Design a protein with these regions (language model features):
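Extracytoplasmic/periplasmic ligand-capture domains
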Residues: 1-98, 102, 111-175
Length: 175
């Protein structure tokens, strides 16, 4: 648990500790009270990312892993690009990481050195680009502003979040 690790570090029970973004300000203030020094070791090698299930297979129970319409969405490059353009990474970094992060455009961060490719395609936050890509893929908005695919299926999908309790702390609920 993060709180225990930080407490052990601050009181000298451990010699080193990683600091999460949410603990950074407390640790920075505690530096004057406890006998330790914070060293900036540079960018983290960890990343947070999501991907879409594109498994067209059938489960052992004989059911498809995905409904056909969702498989069509997730395998359409324009749909995925639209999601990337509609994703406010800076806003997420500010809200979840308290500004202690950087926007990445690959699952390989700069801290990984020679394996990082800074020349990958970048998808800036642009609602206009996202909407244009969705429309080019046959999606549309009905009179209630619900996004639907070309067959009239509302666009809804689940996100599985490993650290969903962190989002709960700020009042964000994913279903």
């Amino acid at each position: 648990e993060s709180n225990t690790a930080i407490a052990h570090f601050a009181t000298g029970k451990s010699d080193a500790s990683g600091i999460s973004a949410e603990d950074f300000e407390w640790v920075k203030r505690a530096q004057g009270t406890y006998d330790f020094t914070i060293y900036n070791r540079g960018p983290s090698a960890s990343v947070n990312f999501f991907w879409f299930n594109q498994n067209a297979g059938i489960s052992e129970e004989g059911r498809p892993y995905l409904p056909k319409h969702k498989l069509e969405w997730f395998t359409d490059k324009r749909f995925r690009q639209a999601i990337l353009h509609g994703f406010n990474r800076e806003g997420l970094i500010d809200a979840i990481l308290f500004g202690k992060g950087e926007v990445l455009h690959s699952i390989i961060p700069p801290a990984k050195g020679e394996w990082h490719n800074p020349n990958v395609r970048k998808y800036d936050y642009s609602i206009a680009k996202a909407k244009a890509l969705l429309q080019s893929a046959g999606f549309y908005w009905d009179s209630d502003r619900t996004l639907k695919d070309r067959n009239g299926e509302p666009v809804r999908f689940n996100l599985l979040l490993v650290e969903s309790d962190r989002y709960d702390q700020i009042g964000v609920t994913f279903v």
